[in-house]
Amino acid sequence: MRILEIFAILLILKEVRPQTKRSHKVNMKTPFQKRKNHHLNTDSRATLMSPADLHSVEHSIVQIRDPTLIPHYDQKSQEDMKLHFLKNTLVTCNDGTTAGYYLRETKGSKRWIIFLEGGWCCYSKETCGVRYDNVKRLMSSSNWPQTRKGTGILSPRQDENPYWWNVNAVFVPYCSSDVWSGNVSKTQDGYAFMGSVIIQEVIRDLVPRGMKQAKSVILAGSSAGGTGVLINIDRVAALVEETTSESVQVRGLVDSGWFLDSRHSKQSDCLDISKCALTEAIKKGLKLWNGILPENCKQQFKKGDEWRCFYGPRLFTSMKSPIFVVQWLYDQEQLRIENIQTEFQSMTENQWNSIQNIGREFKKSLREVPAVFAPACLSHTLITKSNWLEFQVKSVTLAKALHCWDRSLQENRAPKGVIRGCPFHLVDNCQWPHCNPTCPAIYDATSGQELSILQMFLKLRLESQRRGQEPKGDLGPLMSMLRNSG
């Protein structure tokens, strides 16, 4: 019977696999795998993993799949975003160099997108030292390129970015290592943590460049930048309204920054973030950074528990500004925080079941959020990917959902005012990782070949049988879900 079952699966693969074909493949190998053949001190393209014994600290540092991180050496054009340093030179990166932003202005436009870069954080002398040695650009502006290309929602190309290609686009590089919350000019170890102040100064510098006449401002961010949006959006809204001459709508776009409380906890002193709870790193960091958190959120917790305001589900209930949450249901960073690896050759039964539980927890946490785009995929960050239009939930792209949300806010002035035929609360219904046929491709770590969801499951199942284990669930529901595409 077992042989017949496997044979049946292989027959079905011929039917299902074409659904996963795509013109642009997103490599899902871990950053560590990609980095094996590269020198560690490459600032222009930092990875999430660090060398040898400190690999897990560095793993937490930065996303590598953001094309805007690559210096652009072609002939300068009007499509490039150009570097501007802050006028207030006292507002600095970790190492004391002046912070700044990249700007592409569009004449006549009164719409603005301000994007906060991600890249995790450092929270002690040791972790900040590792970060500075390996990804200096996340702590210093000294080697920033003069221009960047905008991609995804920052792209000036209408075919790549149909609704926001002609807005004023701002990219704020992350060089404060404090999840955009810090407010200290120099610690005893010599580092500045001024993320929250940098955002405020960027807004002030943009006022004479046209923001004074703004009608719409979106504060967006990915990963740590997305968490930075959650933490800062209400203060940004107040500052924008104070400095603009007309009525302006300010809203937030949170990409892969909606983290859940980790179920893992370690009481011992933690220098390596993979060996301790995320909450321990945040607690340490909050003190080091003199972090500024929203007062409305802090009031919900007793003294000493303010760190809970770094988590989206905790923070959302006290927010005033409308936000749109973009969140992979099987976010790779959340899985890493939970000590779950996604290499199917070595995954255990418990890890497989834990991955499914994470998806259910994300769904539950997003129920009361009016504007959501949550595909059932294994990935991390989305809005600045050049192929962001490929991904869909219930046959709706993220760009379309954002446009519907934008229209709803303009026409109804209320976050729950849904326009008929224009949905913007989109959460996949299917129950398995990567059950959405538009998910980014997954590749076999050994062969490099792309895997369909059924091949992935079969690989896991065969490996589990070899170990005398069996992932819970049968293939019938999985096949049905694949045919219905969530």
UniProtKB/Swiss-Prot annotation:
Subcellular location(s) of the protein: Secreted
Catalytic activity: [Wnt protein]-O-(9Z)-hexadecenoyl-L-serine + H2O = [Wnt protein]-L-serine + (9Z)-hexadecenoate + H(+)
InterPro entries: PAE/NOTUM (IPR004963)
Biological process per Gene Ontology, one example term: Wnt signaling pathway
E.C. numbers: 3.1.1.98
Disulfide-bond pairs as recorded: none
Principal location listed in the UniProt entry: secreted
Record-annotated active site: S223, D331, H380
Signal sequence interval, chain numbering: 1-18
GO molecular function: palmitoleyl hydrolase activity
Similarity section: Belongs to the pectinacetylesterase family. Notum subfamily.
Function comment: Carboxylesterase that acts as a key negative regulator of the Wnt signaling pathway by specifically mediating depalmitoleoylation of WNT proteins. Serine palmitoleoylation of WNT proteins is required for efficient binding to frizzled receptors.
Name the UniProt record assigns to this protein: Palmitoleoyl-protein carboxylesterase notum2
Gene transcribed to yield this protein: notum2
